Amino acid sequence: MGYRIGICDDERSQAQGLRDMTEAWARERRLSCRTELFPSAEAFLFACTEDSAFDILLLDVEMPGMTGIDLAKTLRRENSRVQILFVTSHFELAG
């Protein structure tokens, strides 16, 4: 089974690190995955179409413009099946 994974983070190094961890996780489990990076929620929405559904999304909580939480709310109205994980480098937001 292959997974399509989207990572939305405005900090490029964070996004690349998440991609590396995600791909290592998939390799260890002998799963195929295709990972795509997006620098903003708006960039994700622009690139996302009905035929390009993601299985898993990793969304940065704090981004300029639309936040990861706002993006998740928008996506949930359209697709209740996608798995969403929130990520942050702000310790006060981690729980």
Model-derived segments and their meaning:
Residues 9, 59-60:
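Active-site residues of response regulator receiver
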Residues 12-36:
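Two-component/phosphorelay signaling modules centered on CheY-like receiver
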Residues 87-88:
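Hydrophobic/aromatic residues positioned on beta-strands within the core alpha/beta folds
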